[in-house]
Amino acid sequence: MNKISPLGSNWNEFEQQIFNEEEIRESNLRVALIKELITSRQQLGISQKQLETLSGVKQPMIARIEKGQTNPQLETLLKLLAPLGKTLSIVPLRVKNA
């Protein structure tokens, strides 16, 4: 692991010190969703502007979502995912064994 400070903490240790398990899990889910959105859009060769036309979600909002600068509503995510041939699904969380 890369050191993030002269004190020797790595990112995982630092993350666990400042966030609780629920916050870490929530952040990981958000990152995975954004990554899937970007990857799907790029694999289809669709620009953010084209996705705006297909989804009805304005390009600046798409950019903010992809940068993780906003927490979009469920309806907005569904509008973005549909033209990419994707949807959301409710599945059990993978929980670390105690």
UniProtKB/Swiss-Prot annotation:
Gene3D superfamilies linked to this entry: lambda repressor-like DNA-binding domains
Signal peptide coordinates: none
SUPFAM superfamilies xref list: lambda repressor-like DNA-binding domains
Keyword Transcription regulation: yes
Lineage top rank: taxon: Bacteria
DNA-binding region(s), residue ranges: 48-67
Pfam family, one: HTH_3
Record InterPro entries: Cro/C1-type_HTH, Lambda_DNA-bd_dom_sf
Cross-referenced SMART domains: HTH_XRE (SM00530)
Domain HTH cro/C1-type residues, every copy: 37-91
The entry's keywords: DNA-binding, Transcription, Transcription regulation
Transmembrane helix as UniProt keyword: no
GO MF annotations in UniProt: DNA binding
The protein's name: Uncharacterized HTH-type transcriptional regulator HI_0659
Organism: Haemophilus influenzae (strain ATCC 51907 / DSM 11121 / KW20 / Rd)
